[in-house]
């Protein structure tokens, strides 16, 4: 499966679209012809429909690119004429619900939504006829003839649809759309399971008494998922292996390549006796299985919708309608024979590792997303079948079956597991914050979007020895420290750290650093193999801005150049020597720019970064040793006293930044096992420093706890191959089958 660039995700809100658009009857009549009529016949039978439209409406039942219209008839009739006579059915106030596919275009900056006439999809979801007449044959005649009338005026339907202002939302990054977790696989994988387990009905047989002399029998080949639907609607192809259809004295032989395309919904069923175990939990929860829904939905739509019957041989229009009506009745009566379990959840389960309890689901949902065809053929590898969940009894305010269809392309694999970023922040990124030891956890709040933390009070950041040989406090004011995820990167940002650097100089420094999360496997410096280690990696030079007042600039050559040089060189290289040479201050002076507020600003750039790294070589291992000593204080002094002791222990600005960075990295590595135990963090910092990666904890235990409560029916195990931040915390991998 080739990796594709991710387009924007367009989320259609048909509830809001329906509620916020009220199309008048006058507008409707201006576009849609009032009268409709259609007739078909053969030597045995003629069927005619005629009537007048009352109104068409867009409903709120659509999913993804597939809106549903309700077309209401004012008056009319269906007339069936055969050798036994005539029969007339009233259409007064009858209705039909139809589904079609729309496409999106942008013309001169304006969003345009229209029915895809070139690749037209148009089928009946439900109607009022069957409940009234209880006759699937009459139902099929009415459905097909009304759809034919609408299809004849498809351009008018398109004009009518364009009266609606379609409400959508755009997501650039991947999204779980309010769900805490999502576990996805491809249609291809699901189809392999269906084929192997063969839980679909193998045979079909149906006879009907009455004037049409219908009987049908035959065998199905393996049913399979196909594209053409989104959300809760799941499309299947039911290939016909062999069989025959007899109607009105005519025999039609089925052949290979013919099929019935149907649409189903699924539901979760409580299971009293669990059928699988989660090796990472106590298995004290309740199991639910995702199976075919066999009754009407909340909109009273039947469990099975016949989208189309594909035939290769010669059969007239009446015969095909009779066949469709017969299949409609058979499928709705026999769909409970489709025993496939699509997924199973253990809900409300207890994790063996309390630090991973937050990964255990408490509510389950499902959804599908169809990928666009490739060369006219369904793209089953990129089409997504997903099971979503909430954890810790969290609530999804707008629960939806909508699935981000880009997720498999993003991992370039057959399966993916995602965690909503604010949940990742609260449960994993917080370990990095806590281990930095710049404040107690209660000194920080979640930022409004849930993507990180911000300090809620003034913090004593550290104690620095200044140019006069004095130990002075360095502060960070409220809201000036942020640890967050932005642009799919981890970011540490301190807007202003300030301290009295000399009698005439107050140091003001803005510092930020970005990190990527990388999943690494390989051989470490000792020759030992390691696998699936998640490590934060600096992805660029840090951002450093030093502010200098006009008075301070006047003494640049004597004092400020050396002081600022020490800060910059220390941050960039880790070199903490007291003698830099006059050339460094002179070199940095050329990067000073004056602001409109009368201050001078020194911003580090790549040229400066490379120049200083070539000039100075610091021993960064010293900082890791200090970081380890500071983490050990948690065990001896406790968290609060350790933070206070560290903040009041004299150091310098550069050392403080480097040590905090080491502790942050150690905290995140420790998060792989859900732990902020000092011994684990110390071990992580030491191994990371020495590039002894085989000693670091892998992400495997986390992955096992993440997916352990969810089971695909083919007893497959998720084998992780990638991890990244991409709107969500995203794990990609393969599903490897194993024997029970």
Swiss-Prot record:
Record-linked InterPro entries: Clostridium_P47 (IPR010567)
Keywords assigned: Plasmid, Virulence
Induction: Part of both a high- and low-molecular weight complex with other proteins from the ptox and cry loci. Encoded in the ptox locus, possibly in an ntnh-orfX1-orfX2-orfX3-pmp1 operon.
Family annotation (Pfam families): Clostridium_P47
GO molecular function: toxin activity
Function per UniProt: Expression of the ptox operon (ntnh-orfX1-orfX2-orfX3-pmp1) in B.thuringiensis kills Anopheles but not Aedes mosquito 3rd instar larvae. The ntnh-pmp1 construct is about half as toxic.
Family: Belongs to the TULIP P47 family.
Extra facts: P.bifermentans strain Cbm (subsp. malaysia) is toxic to Anopheles mosquito 3rd instar larvae and less toxic to Aedes aegypti larvae.
Protein name, per record: Protein OrfX2
Organism: Paraclostridium bifermentans (Clostridium bifermentans)
């Amino acid at each position: 499966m080739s990796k594709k660039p991710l387009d924007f995700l367009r989320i259609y809100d048909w509830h809001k679209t329906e509620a916020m658009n009220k199309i008048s009857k006058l507008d409707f009549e201006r576009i849609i012809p009032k009268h409709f009529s259609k007739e078909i016949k053969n030597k045995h039978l003629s069927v005619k429909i005629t009537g007048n439209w009352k109104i068409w409406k867009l409903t709120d039942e659509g999913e993804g690119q597939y809106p549903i219209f309700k077309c209401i008839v004012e008056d009319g009739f269906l007339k069936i004429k055969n050798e036994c006579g005539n029969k007339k059915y009233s259409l007064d106030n009858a209705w039909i619900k139809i589904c079609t596919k729309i496409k999106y275009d942008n013309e001169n900056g304006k969003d345009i939504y229209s029915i895809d006439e070139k690749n037209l999809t148009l089928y009946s979801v439900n109607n009022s006829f069957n409940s009234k007449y209880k006759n699937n044959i009459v139902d099929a005649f009415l459905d097909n003839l009304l759809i034919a009338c609408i299809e004849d005026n498809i351009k008018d339907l398109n004009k009518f649809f364009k009266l609606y202002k379609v409400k959508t939302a755009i997501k650039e990054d991947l999204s779980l759309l309010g769900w805490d977790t999502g576990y996805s696989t491809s249609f291809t994988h699901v189809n392999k399971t269906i084929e192997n387990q063969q839980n679909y009905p193998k045979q079909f047989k149906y006879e009907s008494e009455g004037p049409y002399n219908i009987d049908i029998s035959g065998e199905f080949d393996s049913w399979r998922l196909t594209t053409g639907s989104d959300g809760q609607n799941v499309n299947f192809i039911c290939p016909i292996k062999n069989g025959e259809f007899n109607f009105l004295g005519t025999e039609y032989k089925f052949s290979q390549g013919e099929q019935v395309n149907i649409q189903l919904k699924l539901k979760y069923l409580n299971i009293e006796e669990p059928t699988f175990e989660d090796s990472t939990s106590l298995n004290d929860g309740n199991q639910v299985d995702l199976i075919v829904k066999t009754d009407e939905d909340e909109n009273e739509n039947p469990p099975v919708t016949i989208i189309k019957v594909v035939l290769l041989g010669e059969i007239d229009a009446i015969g095909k309608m009779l066949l469709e009506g017969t299949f409609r009745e058979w499928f709705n009566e026999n769909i409970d024979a489709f025993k496939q379990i699509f997924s199973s959840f253990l809900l409300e389960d207890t994790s063996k590792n309390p630090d991973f309890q937050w990964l255990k689901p408490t509510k389950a949902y499902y959804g599908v997303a169809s990928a666009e065809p490739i060369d006219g053929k369904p793209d089953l590898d990129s089409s997504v079948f997903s099971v979503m969940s909430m954890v810790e009894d969290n609530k999804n305010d707008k629960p939806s079956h909508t699935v981000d269809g880009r997720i498999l392309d993003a991992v370039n694999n057959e399966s993916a597991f995602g965690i909503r970023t604010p949940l990742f922040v609260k449960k994993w990124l917080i370990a990095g914050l806590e281990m930095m030891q710049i404040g107690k956890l209660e000194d920080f709040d979640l930022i409004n979007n849930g993507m990180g933390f911000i300090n809620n009070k003034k913090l004593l950041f550290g104690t620095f020895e200044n140019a006069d040989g004095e130990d002075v406090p360095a502060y960070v004011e409220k809201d000036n420290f942020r640890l967050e995820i932005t642009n799919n990167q981890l970011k540490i940002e301190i807007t202003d750290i300030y301290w009295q650097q000399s009698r005439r100089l107050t140091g003001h420094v803005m510092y930020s650093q970005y990190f990527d999360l990388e999943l690494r496997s390989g051989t470490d410096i000792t020759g030992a193999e390691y696998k699936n280690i998640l490590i934060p990696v600096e992805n660029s030079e840090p951002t450093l801005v030093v502010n200098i007042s006009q008075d301070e600039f006047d003494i640049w050559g004597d004092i400020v150049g050396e002081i600022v040089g020490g800060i910059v060189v220390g941050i960039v290289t880790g070199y903490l020597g007291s003698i830099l040479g006059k050339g460094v201050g002179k070199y940095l002076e050329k990067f000073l720019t004056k602001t409109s507020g009368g201050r001078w600003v020194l911003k580090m750039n790549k040229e400066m970064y490379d120049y200083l790294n070539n000039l100075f070589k610091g021993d960064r291992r010293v900082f890791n040793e200090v970081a380890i000593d500071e983490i050990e204080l948690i065990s001896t002094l406790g968290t609060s006293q350790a933070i206070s002791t560290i903040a009041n222990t004299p150091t310098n600005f550069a050392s403080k930044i480097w040590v905090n960075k080491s502790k942050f990295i150690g905290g995140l590595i420790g998060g792989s096992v859900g732990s902020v135990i000092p011994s684990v963090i110390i071990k992580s910092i030491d191994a990371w420093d020495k590039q002894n990666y085989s000693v670091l904890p892998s992400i495997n235990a986390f992955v096992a706890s993440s997916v352990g409560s969810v089971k695909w029916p083919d007893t497959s195990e998720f084998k992780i191959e990638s991890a990244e931040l991409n709107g969500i915390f995203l794990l990609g991998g393969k599903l490897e089958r194993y024997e029970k």
